[in-house]
Structure formats: C-alpha cells, structure tokens
Amino acid sequence: MASKPIGRAGDVQFAADGLFEFLRIAGQADAEFNKKMRIAAEQVAQHVVDRAKVNAQGQPKHGQNRPGSSGMSQAQAVVNGLRARRDRIPTIKLDHKRGFVSASLPNRKRKTKVTMGDVFFGAEFGGRRRPTTQQFLRHRGRQGYFFWQAVRDSNSFIAKEYSDAIDRVLKELAQGAT
C-alpha cells in the first residue's frame, strides 16, 4: 500500500490508492469499524505530530534574544498548534486561528492580531526574499524545516502502522461477529 500525503501544509492527510473506497464499504458493513479506525488513525497521526515537535526543537532561534523574548524559535511556538485529528485516515490539522504568542510585541498591542496560521508557513518554508519576511529563516522551497520533514521521514512508518491498524480492527470485528 503506497501512501502519500495530500492536502496543504497546515492540513494534511495520508492516503493510499483505493483506500477511500475500502473505508466506505467497510464503514457501511459495520458502524463500529469507523469508531475504531478513527482511534487508530489518530494514534498514527500523533506520531507524526510528535516527530514535528522534535524537529522544531532543533530549529535555531530567529535573530538575537531581545528583552521580553520567549527564547523559543518560531517553529517551536507554531508546532504547539498542530493537532492529530480523529478521522478514519491519519489527519493533522493546524489550529490556524489560535493567537501566536509574541512576548516582544504582544497581540494586545496590535491592531491586526497575529495567528498561528500567519506564522506557520514562514516558519516551515522560510522567507527572507521580501522586506515583510525577514524574520524567518532562509527559503527552502518545498522542503520544509520541521513539519514536512517529519511527514517525509515517517512515510514508511505511516503506511505500515496504518495498514496494521486496519488489519487489527478487521480482526477484532471478525472475532466479535463469531
């Protein structure tokens, strides 16, 4: 089963060929299948979120420490907004409306509030090409610094663990039916 990530950077799902058709048929056959698959897929997605958090810990701080600075890199602050969602396929969502906490210039002093979604793409893919993106690390194209790196590194784990989870759920349901 070859899996591939689909979606945008802040909202990604992992799917394989024919997976959606299989999930539809299996979900219609037994309602308990959907419940158990949601729990199993959330555990697989949580592994990727944990890897992204580890990758974000390794990111350098952006610029000099200033008075009132939290001492965290933007990646460390943004990765706290990533959540593994309970869906039938492993899904990760960014809480993009959540406020981005800045100790040096807090949101209460700003007219337009800064959100996690505003900072995520710069922290993940970089910037420095325009005057408005100088606070980010250098641009790395589609490579990514912490989140997509975790997705790529976990690709084989996701495929294996998710297919094992499908097998476990089907075996549990088969034992319960007899």
Question: What do these predicted regions represent?
Answer:
Residues 135-154:
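Short helix/strand-capping connector loops at secondary-structure junctions
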Residues 11-19:
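Small-xxx-small helix-packing motif
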Residues 150-178:
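C-terminal or internal capping secondary-structure element at the end of a domain, subdomain, or sheet
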Residues 2-5, 24-137, 173-178:
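Short, low-complexity, charged/polar segments at coil/turn and helix-coil boundaries
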